[in-house]
């Protein structure tokens, strides 16, 4: 096994996957004082993402995972913005090379990570899985419910996103999206049963991402829940500025409901694509935690 390095500042990172998520991630990294993108890696040198990266002076490669076999010693961390199927191939190679990974696919290889909940507690992990967009939006709420309520019989999350924000990888990974989101919800809330639903809304003009959490609990305690939400929601907003509570928490017939909306900052993607923005923001928040840890060593 390799070194799993933590570099001196800034952290030397690479992006694997040059689609919408990878390109938006690149623009966000350009603003970070703790991260430097030293490679933008995909399969097509003529993709729009590669063209954008070259215009920013970022080194590009169309060698895909093979690039890291040849240049792994230069890189501290890789963001994998490909697909769940591809990450199953990439993960063992990157581990053997000793490169840390933040996985933006629903592959479930690494530890599931929600920055507002876990933050620095997972920094010894070599692979962090950023769950899904719906998972990032709902998990802070599900965790707060699990921490403050009694037994949770059932927890359901419904996320509605604009159809135009769901690219090929999102549509290809729908089954993995459901399974990964449900697993994260169960782990964080302790619910006996969980269900995740994703709605692709074709409405024009495009809607912002909207996520609702429903939880059937014994003896709901709204005061305890509101107190913890007043802590975890600002922690989420610290890295996702467009994360806002739209409704609740409220109780109806023993069922707690909370709704949030997520609006993106409009780097490479439209502002309505909050579903893509939130997972990128979460990934960068964790990469910056790695960088801070390196600075303290």
UniProtKB/Swiss-Prot annotation:
Name of this chain's protein: Acetaldehyde dehydrogenase
Binding site for NAD(+): 18-21, 165-173, 275
Keyword annotations of the record: Aromatic hydrocarbons catabolism, NAD, Oxidoreductase
Source organism phylogeny: Bacteria, Pseudomonadati, Spirochaetota, Spirochaetia, Spirochaetales
Enzyme class: oxidoreductase
Gene3D superfamilies: Dihydrodipicolinate Reductase, domain 2, NAD(P)-binding Rossmann-like Domain
EC number(s) reported in the record: 1.2.1.10
Similarity remark: Belongs to the acetaldehyde dehydrogenase family.
Enzyme active site: 133
Catalyzed reactions per annotation: acetaldehyde + NAD(+) + CoA = acetyl-CoA + NADH + H(+)
Pfam families on file: AcetDehyd-dimer (PF09290), Semialdhyde_dh (PF01118)
Keyword Nuclease attached: no
Gene Ontology annotations of biological process type: catabolic process
Highest rank taxon of the organism: Bacteria
A GO term for molecular function: acetaldehyde dehydrogenase (acetylating) activity
HAMAP family, per the entry: Ac_ald_DH_ac
């Amino acid at each position: 096994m390799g070194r799993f390095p933590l570099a001196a500042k800034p952290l030397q990172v690479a992006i694997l996957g040059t689609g919408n998520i990878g390109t938006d991630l690149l623009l966000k990294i350009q603003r970070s004082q703790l991260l430097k993108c030293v490679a933008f890696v995909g399969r097509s040198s003529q993709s729009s993402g590669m063209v954008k990266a070259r215009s920013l002076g970022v080194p590009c490669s169309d060698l895909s995972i093979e690039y890291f076999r040849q240049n792994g010693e230069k890189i501290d961390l890789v963001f994998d913005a490909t697909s769940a199927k591809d990450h199953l191939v990439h993960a063992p190679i990157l581990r053997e090379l000793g490169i840390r990974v933040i996985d933006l696919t629903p592959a479930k290889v690494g530890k599931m990570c929600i920055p507002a909940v876990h933050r620095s507690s997972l920094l010894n992990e070599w692979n962090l899985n950023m769950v899904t967009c719906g998972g990032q939006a709902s998990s802070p709420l599900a965790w707060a419910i699990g921490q403050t309520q009694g037994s949770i019989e059932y927890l359901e999350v419904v996320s509605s996103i604009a159809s135009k924000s769901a690219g090929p990888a999102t549509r290809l990974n729908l089954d993995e999206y459901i399974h990964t989101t449900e697993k994260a919800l169960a782990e964080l809330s302790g619910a006996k049963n969980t269900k995740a639903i994703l709605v692709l809304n074709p409405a024009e003009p495009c809607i912002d991402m909207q996520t609702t959490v429903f939880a059937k609990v014994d003896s709901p305690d709204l005061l305890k829940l509101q107190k913890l939400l007043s802590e975890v929601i600002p922690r989420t907003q610290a890295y996702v500025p467009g994360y806002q509570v739209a409704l609740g928490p409220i109780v109806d017939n023993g069922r707690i409901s909370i709704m949030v909306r997520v609006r993106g900052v409009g780097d490479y993607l439209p502002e309505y694509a909050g579903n893509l923005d939130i997972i990128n923001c979460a990934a960068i928040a964790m990469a910056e935690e790695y960088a801070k840890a390196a600075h303290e060593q």
